[in-house]
Amino acid sequence: MLGLFTGTMIFMKNILLFVTLLLITVACNKKEDTSYNIVKYNPNDKSCQTSPDELFSSLEIIPLEGPEDVIIDTESNVIYDNNRFYIIDAIRRKRIDIFNAQGQYISSIKAFGRSGNEYIGIDHVQLLDSLVAVYSCHNKALYYFDINGTFVKKEPIQYAPLDLLKVRDGYWGYVGNAGEIPARIVKMDMKGKIIEKYLPVSKIIPLTEESSVFIPYKGDLLIRETLRSDIFKIDSTGNVHTFISFDFGRYNVPRSYFENNDPVAAATKLMQSDIAIMDRFFVNDDYMVLSVDFQMADDSDAAFSSLGICHRDKWKWLRSEHRGALSMFYSTTKALTQKSALIILSEAQPILDFKKVYPELVPEFNHNTDNSFIVLCHLKE
């Protein structure tokens, strides 16, 4: 099964090739603050692990049905809104396929190209005023499409960060590996001009992100970064706090990685380490969810993934490998709905493998298809 972690692993193996092109100024400069929780997790401690039937009340299997040219890659990102699934293939096909809540195909946004109404890449997708807004860093613009995939308008911006989130009074940008300014986060006005800088940095290291770092939450903005164990919060007054911090023991990214003046040496050291990669973070009124991948330096086949779920201040963890009964959860979590269902994008076989061990959680479904499936994992109260 191709999972999102596959893309992450490919990046890690090729990180040295990116050094000369993609450099980011990064450092660890968090102020001392004891008001946040530090969550410790040892993935090798069996007492820390939880069974799926303790986490989920049921699973809902939704086959994605579409025309022959709609080929769903399970590495794609997913947005769920207003009873629609938006499957975002930003890596391979550079398109967005839209399905209803039953998995029936609605339309596609496939404007990849170089004309005035086409984007070269998909770096972020937002749903704004019933339109789909596609941000392309290369084009320095947002492209708006309606639900039928028809182009509506183009919105150029002055400065183009790697990741972009449009808000009421402007934009948030993630500078990432651009290395153009000494900050990881910028606030921009409605024209895309930088007006504020956040999370100042001082060292040069290579870094990239597989999914958006931005998580809007109750009027604040949360920031998740792949190789950092802190989730930062920028509140409505512009102050930066640590929202929550994770301690993975020996899998924590070495501090020397952020302090090394030589980006090649830093990347080499990272590839020689067993590390935790914070892939996704979700939060709603009742739950926090962290998807974290663990890379093994000496054995790529030994890599594994863990899903952390917090409810009523208690964290539970589910560890999964890329084979076996729990392979369906191997770095495949895409989103958390407001009704507290985790969205997983999977092929049929991992679901069948899971069903053999946990038949009470999985309903009967038609698996004689080449299509991918949306799996809604309903969290227990």
Per-region residue spans from a language model:
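C-terminal motif of bacterial Sec signal peptides marking the signal peptidase cleavage site
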Residues: 26-27
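Blade/loop signatures of beta-propeller domains
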Residues: 31-65
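Beta-strand-rich domains and repeat architectures in extracellular enzymes and scaffolds
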Residues: 60-94
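Blade-loop segments of beta-propeller domains
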Residues: 65-70, 104-130, 136
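Short coil/turn segments at the loop-to-beta-strand junctions that recur within blades
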Residues: 68, 110-118, 156-162, 201-206, ...
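Repeated scaffold domains used in trafficking and secretory/extracellular systems
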Residues: 73-77, 119-124, 159-167, 206-213, ...
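Asp-box/WD-like beta-propeller blade repeats and closely related beta-sheet repeat scaffolds
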Residues: 121, 136-183, 197-206
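Conserved blade-ending motifs and adjacent loop-strand segments that build the rim/top face
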Residues: 244-264, 309-339
